[in-house]
Amino acid sequence: MVQIHTEKNQKEIKRHGNYEFPVNISPESIQSYEQGYFLWHWHPEIELTWIISGQMEYYVNDQKYLLSEGEGLFGNSNTLHSGYMKDGQDCDYLSVTFHPRFIYGYENSLLQTKYVDFITSNELWHSLKFEKDVTWHQDIIRQIQDICQLAQEPPEDYELQVHMILCSIWQKLYLHYVSQ
């Protein structure tokens, strides 16, 4: 059994990748956590979740989601979140966690100020459920699946491919939020 470890302010104590490649791709099972849930925590990284099988009750700040097989979630930077087993059933999922600088490159770049901060600094946009019946949501789910495939057998240009996919996902999120 595992559990998330946090500081007193609930910030997760875990490295999500490293400075050179700030991405963590992690297959998970909710049943592997003590008592079938992971503790409330936050981190500066953005988190994309894809439900491989089963269901999970997922909380982000004050929002509750029921995530089912084939669905997913965008969890913004610095959002408090937790996940719980649903009706005692296991849930397998993939978590792709990455630092925002992986998208924008360097501090105060146009990519940061125009495209990344626009989303990460808006407290109203703490999360977004990727639904099965929304085409652009399913495009993102397929891209998360592509990242999963790449991680299983990393090709020579693995990091570059992951970067391009995450930038494409970010573009879709940006176009959604800029139209709000």
Residue ranges and their predicted role:
Residues Q35-W42, Y84-K86, Y106-N108, Y158:
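Short histidine-centered beta-strand/loop micro-motifs
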Residues S53, R101, S121, Q152, ...:
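Residue-level marker of positions within ordered structural domains that often coincide
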Residues F130-Q180:
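An amphipathic alpha-helical interaction segment
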Residues V2-N24, L80-C148:
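A hydrophobic/aromatic-rich effector-binding and dimerization subdomain
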Residues M1-G72, N78-T79, T113, L124-L128:
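Generic protein-terminus/edge-of-domain signal
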Residues P27-S29, T120, L173:
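Hydrophobic aliphatic residues
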